[in-house]
């Protein structure tokens, strides 16, 4: 059985980075966590470290924006045809100027750890 998680909505057409670059930035941040032998991911929160790395990279790219990053972690270990029932809802709202501010959602899956990360990045023009 294959579990499918879809991400809908978002407003990335006015992003300070092209969508492709945002995806690369997130993936590279995650890969660097996995490759760093000094980080013990069993004791440190992967999501908190990922948020920190993503925000650091975004801030280096442009100081014209304030950034907010959110990571929702799903542990999909043990899901099978008999036990494939889970529910997740995450809502976020912001008051912004739609021509300058926006939001980007991304799903990052780690097949090795049976975890899926739902990442949201918001940018607000200063």
UniProtKB/Swiss-Prot annotation:
Keywords noted in UniProt: Acetylation, Cell projection, Cytoplasm
The listed locations are: Cytoplasm; Cell projection
| Entry's transmembrane regions | none
Could you state one GO cellular component term attached to this entry? cytoplasm
The record's listing under InterPro entries reads: Tctex-1-like_sf
Q: Which CDD domains does this UniProt record tie to the protein?
A: DLC-like_TDA2 (cd21457)
Q: What is its main location?
A: cytoplasm
Q: Which domain of life is it from?
A: Eukaryota
The modified positions for N-acetylserine read: 2
**Keyword Cytoplasm among UniProt keywords:** yes
Q: Which family does it belong to?
A: Belongs to the TDA2 family.
Name assigned to this protein: Topoisomerase I damage affected protein 2
């Amino acid at each position: 059985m294959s579990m499918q998680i879809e991400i809908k909505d978002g407003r990335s057409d006015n992003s300070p980075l092209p969508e492709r670059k945002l995806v690369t930035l997130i993936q590279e941040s995650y890969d660097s966590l996995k490759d760093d032998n000094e980080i013990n991911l069993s004791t440190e929160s992967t999501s908190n470290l990922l948020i920190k790395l993503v925000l650091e990279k975004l801030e280096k790219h442009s100081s014209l924006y304030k950034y907010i990053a959110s990571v929702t972690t799903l542990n999909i270990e043990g899901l099978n045809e008999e036990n494939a029932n889970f529910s997740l809802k995450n809502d976020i709202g912001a008051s912004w100027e739609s021509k300058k501010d926006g939001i980007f959602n991304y799903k990052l899956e780690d097949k090795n750890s049976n975890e899926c990360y739902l990442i949201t990045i918001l940018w607000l023009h200063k």
